């Protein structure tokens, strides 16, 4: 998957980062979009997003990655944050089990506000701190499988699997968009919701993908 300028693209995919404060969402965002990492743990209050345009086959896709930037501390995330999102990374800190214990609540909130067809990846961040691990890979992988989520462990610090996590989500979104585009001749608008929202997914629509590298 190559890079393109942000001015030249065929699709825009909104992807949201959710999870408890301090799990590394902002650094995952900056690592993917700017290849940067900040050791400063101060929390920025507000909603922010960054973009990066990538190639999926012959299509240029502008990934618009949204970060809660601390609002999760105050339960202040609104439905507007989720509106229009076609992908989500649900992030927990694999060295703090309490951040994993609440992923089910985050998942419920996501599904309460987003389209039913949204692509979701569970992300166990801070894999570089393996000796401090509190969440076994197998446990998180099983949760992902049981809930039809993708799953990866990442390290925003040393870049492990960060690129793969975002690429995998974007490819899953693109596959759904392409399928919907082929099945629809009535409109040129591309979303993952509309007629599909609220319906039970068909065979193969929700599939888990536990990736261990």
From Swiss-Prot:
<dbReference type="GO" id="GO:0031143">
    <property type="term" value="C:pseudopodium"/>
</dbReference>
<dbReference type="GO" id="GO:0031260">
    <property type="term" value="C:pseudopodium membrane"/>
</dbReference>
<feature type="binding site">
    <location>
        <position position="157"/>
    </location>
    <ligand>
        <name>GTP</name>
    </ligand>
</feature>
<dbReference type="GO" id="GO:0031268">
    <property type="term" value="P:pseudopodium organization"/>
</dbReference>
<dbReference type="GO" id="GO:0003382">
    <property type="term" value="P:epithelial cell morphogenesis"/>
</dbReference>
<comment type="similarity">
    <text>Belongs to the small GTPase superfamily. Rab family.</text>
</comment>
<dbReference type="GO" id="GO:0010634">
    <property type="term" value="P:positive regulation of epithelial cell migration"/>
</dbReference>
<keyword id="KW-0342">GTP-binding</keyword>
<feature type="modified residue" description="Cysteine methyl ester">
    <location>
        <position position="210"/>
    </location>
</feature>
<feature type="short sequence motif" description="Switch 1">
    <location>
        <begin position="35"/>
        <end position="49"/>
    </location>
</feature>
<dbReference type="GO" id="GO:0031410">
    <property type="term" value="C:cytoplasmic vesicle"/>
</dbReference>
<feature type="binding site">
    <location>
        <position position="44"/>
    </location>
    <ligand>
        <name>Mg(2+)</name>
    </ligand>
</feature>
<feature type="binding site">
    <location>
        <position position="156"/>
    </location>
    <ligand>
        <name>GTP</name>
    </ligand>
</feature>
<feature type="binding site">
    <location>
        <position position="67"/>
    </location>
    <ligand>
        <name>Mg(2+)</name>
    </ligand>
</feature>
<keyword id="KW-0479">Metal-binding</keyword>
<feature type="binding site">
    <location>
        <position position="39"/>
    </location>
    <ligand>
        <name>GTP</name>
    </ligand>
</feature>
<dbReference type="GO" id="GO:0060627">
    <property type="term" value="P:regulation of vesicle-mediated transport"/>
</dbReference>
<feature type="binding site">
    <location>
        <position position="126"/>
    </location>
    <ligand>
        <name>GTP</name>
    </ligand>
</feature>
<dbReference type="GO" id="GO:0008284">
    <property type="term" value="P:positive regulation of cell population proliferation"/>
</dbReference>
<comment type="subunit">
    <text>Interacts (GTP-bound form) with RAB11FIP1, RAB11FIP2, RAB11FIP3 and RAB11FIP4. Interacts (via the hypervariable C-terminal region) with ITGB1 (via the cytoplasmic region); the interaction is GTP-dependent. Interacts with ITGAV. Associates with the integrin alpha-V/beta-1 heterodimer. Interacts with VPS33B.</text>
</comment>
<keyword id="KW-0449">Lipoprotein</keyword>
<feature type="binding site">
    <location>
        <position position="27"/>
    </location>
    <ligand>
        <name>GTP</name>
    </ligand>
</feature>
<feature type="binding site">
    <location>
        <position position="26"/>
    </location>
    <ligand>
        <name>GTP</name>
    </ligand>
</feature>
<feature type="binding site">
    <location>
        <position position="43"/>
    </location>
    <ligand>
        <name>GTP</name>
    </ligand>
</feature>
<feature type="binding site">
    <location>
        <position position="70"/>
    </location>
    <ligand>
        <name>GTP</name>
    </ligand>
</feature>
<keyword id="KW-0547">Nucleotide-binding</keyword>
<feature type="lipid moiety-binding region" description="S-geranylgeranyl cysteine">
    <location>
        <position position="209"/>
    </location>
</feature>
<keyword id="KW-0968">Cytoplasmic vesicle</keyword>
<dbReference type="InterPro" id="IPR027417">
    <property type="entry name" value="P-loop_NTPase"/>
</dbReference>
<dbReference type="InterPro" id="IPR001806">
    <property type="entry name" value="Small_GTPase"/>
</dbReference>
<keyword id="KW-0378">Hydrolase</keyword>
<keyword id="KW-0966">Cell projection</keyword>
<keyword id="KW-0813">Transport</keyword>
<feature type="binding site">
    <location>
        <position position="38"/>
    </location>
    <ligand>
        <name>GTP</name>
    </ligand>
</feature>
<feature type="short sequence motif" description="Switch 2">
    <location>
        <begin position="67"/>
        <end position="84"/>
    </location>
</feature>
<dbReference type="InterPro" id="IPR050209">
    <property type="entry name" value="Rab_GTPases_membrane_traffic"/>
</dbReference>
<dbReference type="GO" id="GO:0005525">
    <property type="term" value="F:GTP binding"/>
</dbReference>
<feature type="binding site">
    <location>
        <position position="26"/>
    </location>
    <ligand>
        <name>Mg(2+)</name>
    </ligand>
</feature>
<dbReference type="GO" id="GO:0031489">
    <property type="term" value="F:myosin V binding"/>
</dbReference>
<keyword id="KW-0460">Magnesium</keyword>
<feature type="binding site">
    <location>
        <position position="21"/>
    </location>
    <ligand>
        <name>GTP</name>
    </ligand>
</feature>
<comment type="function">
    <text>The small GTPases Rab are key regulators of intracellular membrane trafficking, from the formation of transport vesicles to their fusion with membranes. Rabs cycle between an inactive GDP-bound form and an active GTP-bound form that is able to recruit to membranes different set of downstream effectors directly responsible for vesicle formation, movement, tethering and fusion. RAB25 regulates epithelial cell differentiation, proliferation and survival, thereby playing key roles in tumorigenesis.</text>
</comment>
